[in-house]
Amino acid sequence: MPNIKSAIKRTKTNNERRAHNATIKSAMRTAMKQVETFVSNNEADKAKAALSAAAKKIDKAAKKGLVHKNTAARYKSNLAKKVNGLSA
């Protein structure tokens, strides 16, 4: 446990940020799983709508530095391939 006042404040801030970042990453993962569910159930319209929502959450996570921009691009690309495979 830190003794210096500024270190105590930083610890508190870090814990708050970690919790906030975890909720954003969790929402991103949930959105991705929702797309996967619609794809596995062959629901093309719902999958496309969920894909745009998931892409938005993935981009937000990348913008905040929670995932690397190339990782975000890979996530979106893989989801898009699966959704586009439904309509083909």
From Swiss-Prot:
Q: Is the Signal keyword given for this protein?
A: no
Q: Does the keyword RNA-binding apply?
A: yes
Gene3D superfamilies assigned to the protein according to its UniProt record, in alphabetical order:
Ribosomal protein S20
Keyword annotations for this protein?
A: Ribonucleoprotein, Ribosomal protein, RNA-binding, rRNA-binding
Q: Name one GO cellular component term.
A: cytosol
- Output the GO biological process annotations, alphabetical, semicolon-separated: translation
Q: One MF term from GO for this chain? A: structural constituent of ribosome
Summarizing the function annotation, the protein's role is: Binds directly to 16S ribosomal RNA.
Q: Which family does it belong to?
A: Belongs to the bacterial ribosomal protein bS20 family.
Protein's recorded name: Small ribosomal subunit protein bS20
Recorded source organism is Bacillus licheniformis (strain ATCC 14580 / DSM 13 / JCM 2505 / CCUG 7422 / NBRC 12200 / NCIMB 9375 / NCTC 10341 / NRRL NRS-1264 / Gibson 46)
This protein's encoding gene: rpsT
